[in-house]
Amino acid sequence: MGLTGTNTTLVAPQPKGILDPRTGKPVGSDDAFFNDLNGELSDKGFIVTSADALITWARTGSLMWMTFGLACCAVEMMHISMPRYDAERFGIAPRASPRQSDVMIVAGTLTNKMAPALRKVYDQMPEPRYVISMGSCANGGGYYHYSYSVVRGCDRVVPVDIYVPGCPPTAEALLYGILLLQKKIRRTGTIER
């Protein structure tokens, strides 16, 4: 038992991961970031990186989103958690508490009475926090733009990072918006200089 008496080097087996049925390669094998990481790890046995790059990589791989479904767009927001789209494979998962969330997805018509509650939930989220505006009602009021009780875009209440157009937008459009947010997080620095 243990490592005594072994003459071979201890090497972890090649990770198999989830294979893409179309190409037969592991999912994410064409990602330049991971190819550089794997090349450096197999060459040296360790990785040299900046803390900024490591923090950014961790943030993009573990986005927890706050569900703020206000109207029919919320149904499409639920679809990305189902098996067909499986948003968790991209490192995103819904959370019920704003204190555990990184992203707020505003899906639907924001009314004047709901605006203070939206802002309160946004203020309870820890930094860095991001907002995705989903659907034409959240983006600019939609069909109810001229109603006295509708806020003409949630960007009047909270700062919005990604706009997903459509009425309602498809689950693919929301998934694309989340991937754009991950790309935006990778581009921005984490440490203020």
Curated annotation (Swiss-Prot):
Keywords: 4Fe-4S, Cell inner membrane, Cell membrane, Iron, Iron-sulfur, Membrane, Metal-binding, NAD, Quinone, Translocase, Transport, Ubiquinone. It is a peripheral membrane protein. It is an enzyme of class 7 (translocase). GO terms for cellular component: plasma membrane; respiratory chain complex I. It comes from the Bacteria. One of its GO terms (biological process) is electron transport coupled proton transport. Residues 1-11 have a biased composition (Polar residues). Its EC number is 7.1.1.-. [4Fe-4S] cluster binds at C72, C73, C137, C167. Coiled coil: none annotated. It catalyses: a quinone + NADH + 5 H(+)(in) = a quinol + NAD(+) + 4 H(+)(out). It is found in: Cell inner membrane. Its cofactor is [4Fe-4S] cluster. GO terms for molecular function: 4 iron, 4 sulfur cluster binding; iron ion binding; NADH dehydrogenase (ubiquinone) activity; NADH:ubiquinone reductase (non-electrogenic) activity; quinone binding. It holds the Pfam family Oxidored_q6. Residues 1-23 are annotated as: Disordered. The keyword 4Fe-4S applies. NDH-1 shuttles electrons from NADH, via FMN and iron-sulfur (Fe-S) centers, to quinones in the respiratory chain. Couples the redox reaction to proton translocation (for every two electrons transferred, four hydrogen ions are translocated across the cytoplasmic membrane), and thus conserves the redox energy in a proton gradient. NDH-1 is composed of 14 different subunits. Subunits NuoB, C, D, E, F, and G constitute the peripheral sector of the complex. PANTHER family: NADH DEHYDROGENASE, NADH DEHYDROGENASE [UBIQUINONE] IRON-SULFUR PROTEIN 7, MITOCHONDRIAL. Belongs to the complex I 20 kDa subunit family. This is NADH-quinone oxidoreductase subunit B.
